[in-house]
Design a protein with these regions (language model features):
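Structural motif
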Residues: 69-73, 105, 201-203
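Cysteine-nucleophile active-site neighborhood
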Residues: 77-153
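Glycine-rich beta-alpha junction loops
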Residues: 25-27, 164-166, 206-208
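A glycine-centered loop/beta-turn motif at secondary-structure junctions
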Residues: 186-224
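Beta-strand-turn-beta hairpins that frame and shape the catalytic cleft
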Residues: 17-19, 152-157, 195-200
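Pocket-forming structural segment of enzyme catalytic cores
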Residues: 121-192
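N-terminal beta1-alpha1 cap of cysteine-dependent amidohydrolase-like domains
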Residues: 1-99, 210-253
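Conserved beta-strand scaffold positions in the cores of enzyme catalytic domains, especially
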Residues: 23, 54, 131, 159-161, ...
Length: 253
């Protein structure tokens, strides 16, 4: 399935190479603008010369075998419950793809379920698929507000967090970044998100990728190298992005 954005086809001839982006559970895990990550990534890949196909996957669908990047968003606890059985049905495929180097971006609720488990505030335990060495505990208050963080890989990352889950990383992964404004994974260690293989997990909504093109470029490069063995980036004018980032960093919490 090829989507269009703003009336223009995402897929148009350029370098003759195609990247296929899969959006996980858009019906149940698409909140706070997370679908914008897929749209921004498609646009960015197109700017780098790729044809792009965007595919949806919802519970009960046949999981496609020939995708290059996987994106998953956040949702309410009820949405996590709805998808849990199906997520475990495809969990082995997702884990193998992650271990094989497929780039993935998972936000908030799916970030939690890519870990070992999520213990909800109501006492229910939702088992994760154990791609990320982390567990999450439901907190008593929501952590809401603008967030700024520093990453060794991506520089300054800006976004918006809105979660009550408190996530704690194990030794098998690294944090995505260190929080300079906001809370992040939990209220104690100043870490935010997680990195393992080519998987990026984070609590940042907003959407994340329009304001953080370095992460988009990372996902695109990883996918291109994995599929074609090479990546030649185009020079992209990010002047408007930099203005948006500067504005976001000045916003109050």
């Amino acid at each position: 399935m090829t989507h269009t954005i703003a009336g223009e086809p995402v897929s148009s001839p350029n370098n003759g190479k195609t990247l296929r982006i899969l959006q996980l559970y858009p019906k149940d895990m698409n909140i706070y603008g997370d679908w914008g990550n897929t749209l921004a990534l498609a646009r960015r890949a197109h700017a780098h010369g790729f044809d792009v196909e965007i595919l949806d996957y919802n519970p009960g669908d046949t999981f496609p075998d020939d995708v290059d990047i996987i994106i998953g968003g956040g949702g309410q606890d009820s949405g996590q419950t709805v998808i849990q059985e199906d997520l475990h049905a495809i969990g082995a495929k997702l884990k193998k793809n992650a271990e094989d180097g497929m780039p993935m971006l998972v936000i908030c609720g799916l970030y939690q379920l890519f870990g070992k488990e999520f213990r909800t505030h109501e006492g229910e335990t939702l088992k994760g698929i154990n791609i990320v060495d982390a567990y999450t505990v439901g907190g008593n208050e929501r952590l809401i507000g603008n967030i700024v963080e520093d990453s060794q890989e991506f520089g300054t990352i800006v976004g918006f967090e809105n979660h009550s889950g408190l996530t704690y990383l194990g030794a098998g992964c690294e944090p995505l970044a260190t929080v300079t404004k906001g809370v992040g994974n939990n209220s104690t260690d100043h870490h935010e998100g997680a990195r393992v293989h080519n998987v990026v997990g984070t609590y940042l909504h907003g959407s994340l990728l329009p304001k953080n093109p370095k992460i988009s470029d990372y996902l695109i490069e990883a996918a291109a190298q994995r599929k074609y063995g090479e990546f030649t980036p185009e020079k992209i004018d990010d002047s408007m992005v930099e203005k948006a980032r500067a504005s976001a960093m000045k916003r109050p919490r």
